[in-house]
Amino acid sequence: VDKSDSNVFTQFLRIIDMRKICYSLLILLLMAIVGCSGSKPHVKPLINLDLDQDVARQVVVDKEQGQYLGHPTTVLLEDGKTILVVYPKGHGRGAILYKRSTDGGRTWSQRLPTPKSWETSLETPTIFRTQDPSGKKHLVLFSGLYPIRMAHSEDDGQTWTELEKIGDFGGIVAMSSLVHLKNGDYMAIFHDDGRFIRNENKASKFYVYKALSHDGGLTWTAPEVVVTHDSAQLCEAGAVRSPDGRTIALLMRENSRKFNSFITFSTDEGQTWSTPREMPTSLTGDRHTAQYTRDGRLFVSFRDMAKDSPTKGDWVAWVGTWRDLVEGKEGQYRVRLKDNKNQWDSTYPGVEVLPDGTIVTTTYGHWAENEPPYIVSIRLKPTELDALARRR
């Protein structure tokens, strides 16, 4: 064979070998693509737990024969064991009642003396701890509708001022949340449907508002709109910060019942907010109250109002992570804390986390058939939920 012919033949074989390699690589690539498209990353399903019958966890905070007791909020003092609770003698409207626990919610005092004006409260009271720029600590208590009024205490709740208006504006569930901003200010969140913001008594669109305090909660600015929605009725916003402190989220009730609950985020200390979007069914309900557990998870107490939920109207809790909120995931656990015998009337805050990691969550509900609602606390630890989930 001629040498030149041999070189041509060798080159021809090389071309064939290269084509085989290319074809093989192409087949492998196609197989990889098909394999990826046919498989999804494993996502653990939401686990439903039920503590309703675990009566050893339950403590009656207050109950009165024939009397509606509702809508409590709580605050944990710095000693890690004193919890204060306020709640109305009636459905939102009614005299503000006040109790104290000095042992982390295991036992509660008798009803404590309150200022005369607290008997005139028109709406659900809320209580918060604040600190002014000088470092002095205060307790502030709000009572809503028109006008929003406030009382404060300078001695850890031993004595209180009368209720006085904070401005010429009103609102509903004032204040649903209080956020300590990085500059030392406080941002209070409430909502209105047009009736009380200017006392016009004319229902219109729902708006979530904020008011700011520069002096530790003693005085407040005029309200500004945080978010609204063209179709949904957003209200009762529960605030929580990201673990790194850079982002604030508001978890909101949707009052028209046409949507799931909503969430919005701010990365500039509440100056601007993302477009509100729906949350998963597992977080759909009313009056979300969130606290971080000692292991970094989120515990959110709320009234279950998810469509077709077997626990609709009951007191439930959601356990998950901040990332679950951001990514719209279902979370780790959904826990029925107590069966409400009414279709919907139950479950406002609060949620406190003790130094040993115990969660003390307190709310009202129709806990007995044909009886008005009363106030109950439940104590639990996230590790106990983990153990319960493993036994399923």
What are these regions (language model features)?
Residues 12-25:
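Bacterial N-terminal signal peptides that target proteins for export
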Residues 2-5, 17:
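Intrinsic-disorder-associated, low-complexity terminal segments enriched in Asp/Asn/His/Tyr and depleted
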Residues 24-33:
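Bacterial N-terminal signal peptides
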Residues 1, 32-35:
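Gram-negative host-targeted secretion-system effectors, predominantly Type III and Type IV
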Residues 36-392:
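Asp-box/BNR beta-propeller blade signature and adjacent active/binding-site loops
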